[in-house]
């Protein structure tokens, strides 16, 4: 490797913004650039993005970050891509023009298609072979919808004139001027079209959904040189890493070993546990998905999502007006020794794993005349930790692995009260890294390893530093008593919106 190749760039294409982050050889951030883009809601429950706007924002932040840092393309060793998963783009092979907006992972328009597939008895097949639940969340039914609803699309697809990709595939196609049509196993495993056991596109699912194989990208390892771009002006830069956002965060947290887990605390919480080289089937409603091993090879993970994490704090701020800033919660929660018996179950949109109850609704129980603002704020923070424990307990049950420590990232990890309570509630150390940009770091690591910028995953271990480790301090009796109260509160919230 030439001595002047001093940096790796991660392109982090998210649900609301596109970012570019430059890392040096010590995994320090040298520069960042970010641009938001438009969310389109054409009907209730529908969510779309303009693929050309995604490309424009992602391309411009890359150019911007080089300009801001004064770096030349010759100094960039490689580019890694991490992306919002499941979001679906279909475009014309000849022109590179999308035939419809990108259908976003949050979009519910294909729920009826999923119900039809369930009626045809496909639920068990999907679970067993793709690791997923039959839901509108995943890409497969979104592709079918586009082929069924865009005029002439199905005919063009059958003639080999259309291409499909998740956002990673779309970006690589654009960056290589249409030369490379590729994805990685982590993104492929979120399409409902990929067999996670055989590690290839699943012909039965393609047949059931009427999707020709010719539309699909080639699946290549998450750490490999896929092609080159001249977007930075000047020399060709290798595009050498791809991973879906949550798997990228797992890799960025160096969760390479079986049983290692991370929790990303954002609007919701995403928990992933590496289960090693064999897929583990969940009996608790968790997803089985592809993760990445230390050499970029396929590993597997269990994944569970908590719908309301940071969103619960936003509710305290925006609707109840109990706080002015999310950062205030640490202060108010620490002013009282406990919640005075108050539990908040933030089932505002139902409950996710392991309950899967769309009819659950937000509930506050245990209120007495002595309950005050501090107790309610504390109960809201505690609810994030309780829900995370629900998922982690399910993971430990499914995998038979006792968690040694939980690595954490995302905005809410700055809240010391929440991190300590999380550790207490799970009776497990919680490890907060110094650098919390772990999603982008994962993509940078994958790209850097592919081109020899970093020699091995062992070298990456030296780049990982811990800001603080939270050690459990709560007694066994106290923890059990509090968690039992939470379970009772959850029961009160369940099936609330069901029609009598």
From Swiss-Prot:
Database matches in InterPro entries: ATPase_NBD, Carb_kinase_FGGY, Carb_kinase_FGGY_CS, FGGY_C, FGGY_N, Glycerol_kin
Record entry for activity regulation: Inhibited by fructose 1,6-bisphosphate (FBP).
Catalytic activity: glycerol + ATP = sn-glycerol 3-phosphate + ADP + H(+)
Chain residues that bind sn-glycerol 3-phosphate: 15, 85-86, 137, 245
Sequence positions that bind glycerol: 85-86, 137, 245-246
Residues where ADP binds: 15, 19, 267, 310, 411, 415
GO cellular component: cytosol
Family matches, as SUPFAM superfamilies: Actin-like ATPase domain (SSF53067)
Pfam families, per database record: FGGY_C, FGGY_N
Binding site for ATP: 15-17, 267, 310, 314, 411
Pathway(s) of this molecule: Polyol metabolism; glycerol degradation via glycerol kinase pathway; sn-glycerol 3-phosphate from glycerol: step 1/1
Similarity-based family: Belongs to the FGGY kinase family.
Record protein name field: Glycerol kinase
Gene designation per UniProt: glpK
């Amino acid at each position: 490797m030439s001595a002047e190749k001093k940096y790796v760039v991660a392109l982090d294409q998210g649900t609301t913004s596109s970012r570019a982050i430059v890392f040096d050889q010590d995994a320090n951030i040298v520069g960042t650039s970010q641009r938001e883009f438009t969310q389109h809601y054409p009907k209730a429950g529908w969510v779309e993005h303009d693929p050309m706007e995604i490309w424009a924002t992602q391309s411009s932040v890359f150019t911007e970050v080089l300009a801001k840092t004064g770096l030349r393309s010759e100094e960039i060793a490689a580019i890694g891509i991490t992306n919002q998963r499941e979001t679906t783009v279909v475009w014309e092979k000849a022109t590179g023009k999308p035939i419809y907006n990108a259908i976003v992972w949050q979009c519910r328009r294909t729920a009826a298609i999923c119900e039809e597939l369930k009626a045809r008895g496909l639920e068990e097949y999907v679970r067993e072979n793709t690791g997923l639940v039959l839901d509108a969340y995943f890409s497969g039914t979104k592709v079918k919808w586009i082929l069924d609803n865009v005029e002439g699309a199905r005919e063009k697809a059958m003639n080999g004139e259309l291409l499909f990709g998740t956002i990673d595939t779309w970006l690589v196609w654009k960056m290589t001027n249409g030369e490379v049509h590729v994805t990685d196993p982590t993104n492929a495993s979120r399409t409902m079209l990929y067999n996670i056991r055989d590690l290839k596109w699943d012909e039965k699912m393609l047949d059931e959904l009427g999707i020709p194989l010719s539309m699909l990208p080639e699946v290549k390892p998450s750490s490999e040189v896929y092609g080159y771009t001249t977007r930075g002006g000047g020399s060709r830069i290798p595009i050498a890493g791809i991973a879906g956002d949550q798997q990228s965060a797992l890799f960025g947290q160096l969760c390479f070993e079986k049983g290692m887990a991370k929790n990303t605390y954002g609007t919701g919480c995403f928990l992933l546990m590496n289960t090693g080289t064999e897929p583990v089937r969940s009996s608790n409603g968790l997803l089985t998905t592809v993760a990445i091993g230390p050499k970029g090879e396929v590993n597997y993970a269990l994944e569970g999502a908590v719908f309301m994490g940071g969103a619960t704090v936003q509710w305290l701020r925006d609707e109840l007006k109990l706080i002015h800033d999310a950062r205030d919660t640490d202060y108010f929660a620490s002013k009282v020794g406990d919640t005075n018996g108050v539990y908040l179950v933030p089932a505002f949109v139902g409950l996710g794993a392991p309950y899967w109850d769309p009819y659950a609704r937000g509930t506050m129980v245990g209120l007495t005349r002595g309950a005050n603002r501090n107790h309610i704020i504390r109960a809201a923070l505690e609810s994030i930790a309780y829900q995370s424990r629900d998922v982690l307990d399910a993971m430990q049950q499914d995998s038979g692995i006792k968690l040694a420590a939980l690595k954490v990232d995302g905005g809410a990890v700055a809240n010391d009260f929440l991190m300590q309570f999380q550790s207490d509630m799970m009776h497990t150390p919680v490890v907060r890294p110094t650098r919390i940009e772990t999603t982008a770091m994962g993509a940078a690591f994958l790209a850097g390893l592919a081109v020899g910028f970093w020699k091995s995953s062992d070298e990456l271990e030296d780049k990982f530093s811990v800001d603080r480790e939270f050690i459990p301090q709560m007694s066994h009796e106290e923890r059990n008593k509090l968690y039992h109260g939470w379970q009772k509160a959850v029961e009160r919230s369940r099936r609330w919106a069901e029609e009598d």
